[in-house]
């Protein structure tokens, strides 16, 4: 279920403030965030945001096509290793 249109899009206020600081200083720096539920705003275009996937921070470069989507959509949390079977044992083992 999507968010009510009368509420408007959600974005973590600290993340948005850091993005606006970088825009004022004309800087490009990787920002780490745990806020996967934040909506991507036009001010974020051109920045790299490292989104936490539960284990590590995945760097996501923000483009114009991503505006309106959530940050978590671009940092998958699950890794599919294949279904069971003889072949899967050889391929699916982590090194």
Curated annotation (Swiss-Prot):
Span list, region Disordered: 75-95
A GO molecular-function annotation: rRNA binding
Keyword annotations from UniProtKB, A to Z: Ribonucleoprotein, Ribosomal protein, RNA-binding, rRNA-binding
Top-rank taxon: Bacteria
Keyword rRNA-binding: yes
GO CC annotation, single: small ribosomal subunit
Signal peptide location: none
Coiled-coil annotated spans: none
Keyword Ribosomal protein assigned: yes
Positions with biased composition (Basic residues): 80-95
A GO BP entry: ribosomal small subunit assembly
Record family assignment: Belongs to the universal ribosomal protein uS19 family.
Role played: Protein S19 forms a complex with S13 that binds strongly to the 16S ribosomal RNA.
Name of the featured protein: Small ribosomal subunit protein uS19
Taxon lineage: Bacteria, Bacillati, Chloroflexota, Chloroflexia, Chloroflexales
Gene: rpsS
């Amino acid at each position: 279920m999507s968010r009510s249109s009368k509420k408007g899009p959600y974005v973590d206020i600290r993340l948005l403030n850091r993005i606006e600081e970088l825009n004022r200083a004309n800087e490009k720096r990787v920002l780490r965030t745990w806020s996967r539920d934040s909506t991507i705003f036009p001010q974020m275009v051109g920045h790299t945001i490292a989104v936490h996937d539960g284990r590590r921070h995945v760097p996501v470069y923000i483009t114009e096509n991503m505006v309106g989507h959530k940050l978590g959509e671009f940092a998958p949390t699950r890794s599919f290793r294949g279904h069971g079977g003889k072949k899967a044992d050889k391929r699916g083992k982590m090194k």
